[in-house]
Structures are given as C-alpha cells and as structure tokens.
C-alpha cells in the first residue's frame, strides 16, 4: 500500500515538473542588427610633380581654384568638377604654360561666338568634357595641340575647324552625327577616330 502511494506521489511530482518546464519559454537569441556594408574607396593617386587637380566653385573661378599652386612648375591641369567659361579658358591661354588639360569631369559653358582655346601656344593635349554636346568654329582652332580627345558619348556636332598643322590625333565619340565643313583643314593627322553614327562626311 505504501509502495502504491509512493509510486503515485512520484508520478504526480514528475508530472508537475514536466508541466512547469513546459510553461517556461525557451529564451530567444537576440539578433544583432546587420552591420551596414561600407564601400571600399580606392585612395586617389597623388598628383604627379607639375600636376594640379582642382574643383572650380563657379564659372570664372579657375584662377581662384589655383591659388597657392606653383604656376611656374605647372605642366598639367585636371579640373575634377565645376563649370568653366570663356574667362577661365582665357586665363589658361594667357597666364598658364601647361602642356595638358583634362576637363573630362568638368563642364564648359561657352557661347557660339566664344573663342575657347583659340590661339593657345602651349597645350599639347586637350581632353574635352565628357558632357560636351557640340563644338563651335574656334573652340579648338589654331593651337599647337598634337592630341584632342572627346570622351563620353554626348558630342553630336563637331562644328569647328582645328586649323592645326601640329595635330596628329583626334578622337571623336560614336555619338557624333555631323562634322562641319573644313573641320580638319590644314591638319596633318596620323590617327583619326571617327564616329560610326556620321550621316555625312564633308569634303
């Protein structure tokens, strides 16, 4: 009899423990918020000796952007951002002695009657803005540049003549649809890259 009571008591206690353990919630693992992925930014290579890289705050602001630079030693200028106007290009032609200018990430704001780089006697390589859509008569004329590059695919009309016996190479993007008459007169090209979108080639 005592054994039966003891067995019953044991079963009751065991059942109580089981019920008690079922009532307890299993603790949840706290989920840590996902860490944001930080993009890897490649450090920019330092400017080479004689090179300046500037951002122009406003049209006509190139001279101010070059303040503090050793202009006598400057041979290459890269304008990383900003809008340049005719006053900026006049400053390049009249006050600087650079041999290369890279405007691929800048913007030119010139009127149809503006002269651009006309008459520049030191530039050997000109890289035009990637967003330029047209060129006019004198913008790249009568320079001593041996190479002119038009990056990007915005240029539709190459309307100006270069009139440059020194020019050996010019690269026009595939977006160009028309070339002005006598555009390459008085030039001695060794290499010319024309657009596949040209509707006609002037003679």
For each predicted feature, which ranges?
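Short acidic, Gly/Pro-enriched loop/turn segments at secondary-structure junctions
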Residues: 85-89
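Structural signature of tandem-repeat unit edges
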Residues: 51-57, 75-84, 97-109, 121-134, ...
């Amino acid at each position: 009899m005592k054994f039966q009571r003891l067995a019953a008591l044991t079963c009751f206690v065991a059942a109580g423990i089981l019920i008690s353990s079922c009532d307890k919630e299993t603790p949840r693992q706290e989920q840590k918020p996902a860490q944001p992925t930080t993009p890897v930014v490649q450090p920019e290579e330092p400017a080479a000796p004689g090179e300046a890289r500037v951002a122009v705050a406003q049209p006509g602001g190139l001279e101010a952007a070059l303040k503090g630079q050793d202009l006598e030693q400057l041979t290459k200028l890269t304008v990383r951002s900003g809008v340049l106007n005719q006053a900026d290009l006049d400053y390049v032609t009249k006050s600087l002695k650079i041999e290369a200018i890279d405007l691929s990430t800048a913007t030119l704001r010139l009127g149809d009657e503006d002269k651009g780089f006309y008459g520049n006697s030191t530039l050997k390589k000109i890289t035009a803005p990637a967003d330029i859509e047209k060129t006019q008569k004198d913008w790249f004329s009568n320079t001593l540049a041996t190479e002119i590059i038009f990056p990007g695919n915005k240029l539709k009309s190459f309307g100006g003549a270069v009139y440059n016996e020194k020019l050996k190479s010019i690269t026009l993007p595939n977006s160009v649809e028309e070339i002005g008459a006598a555009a390459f007169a008085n030039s001695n090209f060794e290499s010319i890259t024309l657009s596949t979108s040209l509707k006609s080639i002037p003679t």
